[in-house]
């Protein structure tokens, strides 16, 4: 990104076309292993009100058996206040500094594909800080907001790009995505609503419902379609969905086996979501 002056290209790929967006949302890039002081200063700065996190599941160092912080070597390194190696360490030391300097409210929002992501992030951070100062851990527990969220957008791997994309122009940091996207945030904060304004950002009371419909209608049917398609000689999901046998199987599976098990909420249109999912599967990108 630095070689491109922080610009990157978003290729929004539809079934038949590519919409290209050149984006420059970053004022400055920092590297966690080198810029720990500046990162902690930014977290502590009272002008910082919202932090979003995208780090993948492993970055949380969460022990799913004990449901607590995994005290592995990297976490132990950070607890010993050596050169910080983890996201948990950066967030924790930044919040410790914030507690000492101003105690201002802050929202830390996980965008990772992880069920109850906000609760998990809150747990690992408070566990980490409790090893250093239990009073500060209590402040984080009570005052720092960690909303749970769910992002619904398919973002393909860019290691092997479609020919249509490679022929456009070179970009070392390009991102591919489908046109469909929703971001659900479990929080009714008027402040967040005023700061995160977009028609595809939706504030909800119960994120578990939206996690459930994504897992059951999108993820499960994607897997089922892939398995059946492979058995029938198809290489890609978009090829399988164009096979009448596969389409009928998935459509009936969703209508008869999945949707009836989901209790409707917030006037969410499950049938329309199913139609959107089947359309998304036709996207050959």
Mark where each language-model region is.
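Substrate/ligand-engaging "lid" and interaction regions
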Residues: 1-285
């Amino acid at each position: 990104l630095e070689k491109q002056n922080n610009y990157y290209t978003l290729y929004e790929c539809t079934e038949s076309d590519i919409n290209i967006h050149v984006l420059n949302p970053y004022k400055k890039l920092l590297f966690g292993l080198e810029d720990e002081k500046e990162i902690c200063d930014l977290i502590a700065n009272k002008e910082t009100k919202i932090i979003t996190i995208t780090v993948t599941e492993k970055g949380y160092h969460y022990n799913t058996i004990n449901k607590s912080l995994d005290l592995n070597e990297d976490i132990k390194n950070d607890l010993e206040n050596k050169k910080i190696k983890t996201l948990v360490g950066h967030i924790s030391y930044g919040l410790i500094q914030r507690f000492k300097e101003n105690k201002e409210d802050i929202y830390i929002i996980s965008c990772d594909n992880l069920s109850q992501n906000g609760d998990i992030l809150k747990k690992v951070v408070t566990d980490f800080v409790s090893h250093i100062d239990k009073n500060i851990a209590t402040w984080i527990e009570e005052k720092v907001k960690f909303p749970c969220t769910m992002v619904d957008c398919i973002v393909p791997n860019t290691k092997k790009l479609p020919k249509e994309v490679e022929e456009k122009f070179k970009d070392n940091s390009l991102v591919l995505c489908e046109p469909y996207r929703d971001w659900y945030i479990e929080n009714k904060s008027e402040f967040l609503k005023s700061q995160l304004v977009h028609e595809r950002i939706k504030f909800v009371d119960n994120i578990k419902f939206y996690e459930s419909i994504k897992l059951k209608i999108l993820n499960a049917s994607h897997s089922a379609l892939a398995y059946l398609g492979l058995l029938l000689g198809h290489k890609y999901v978009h090829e399988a969905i164009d096979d009448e046998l596969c389409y009928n199987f998935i459509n009936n599976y969703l209508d008869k086996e999945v949707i009836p098990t989901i209790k409707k909420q917030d006037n969410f249109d499950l049938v329309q979501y199913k139609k959107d999912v089947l359309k998304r599967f036709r996207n050959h990108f």
